């Protein structure tokens, strides 16, 4: 059985101001006090980037979800709006004694419902395995290990992101809101039950571990010169030699890796400026 010491949660929306789903979910849960259904848990709500939310923009000066490394928060010369917000949020989360963070996001990529985990902590893996069994659409993603995560969910060890897509930027999507609320409620129900050891432990969890990112082919001026091949789909296997990009002049760029990989965040609109057309993962089954 899984026994959790989680008592205090942060539910975060609006880290990216044009991802309206998380903003709406936080507002609804706070206004309607949905947390009363989970009395063993203390829920704290955060709308992370108020100016960007008001402007319906991803960010004001820079991506807030790249501002949470400890060394950046301690740097007195970093004074952009999001850098200041990162310090404020880190302070508030620390004062509240938060021991679990759920960060709500959407993506323009057709990824369905994805859980992005901080680390392979047994509680996170058991939770992810439980949720995957509840909803076959759910996939579990882990980024490459980093000592100091730049994401808000990295402010405590037990953190995860709910990432839902495809959802266009800046829109109110009732279906995405409903799916996010359902997944969030299941997370809280699991954590509530685990405080008294009332959930079974899983044997393993299937995880997609990020190993690389790929940019679009570009010319000498940095302009994109090719399109992602239409048969490339999120979480669908890419084998060596598979065409990845079709160029406007008719040539093809194939996948040149040596092993089968599984792409995610395919064509994510916000990642063009980061030089990312897609991320590549390996699918693994991790024993818990």
Curated annotation (Swiss-Prot):
Co-factor(s): Zn(2+)
GO cellular component: cytosol
EC category: hydrolase
Entry's Gene Ontology molecular function annotations: aspartoacylase activity; hydrolase activity, acting on carbon-nitrogen (but not peptide) bonds, in linear amides; hydrolase activity, acting on ester bonds; zinc ion binding
Reactions catalysed, as given in the entry: an N-acyl-L-aspartate + H2O = a carboxylate + L-aspartate
Family: Belongs to the AspA/AstE family. Aspartoacylase subfamily.
Official protein name in the record: Probable aspartoacylase
Organism name: Synechocystis sp. (strain ATCC 27184 / PCC 6803 / Kazusa)
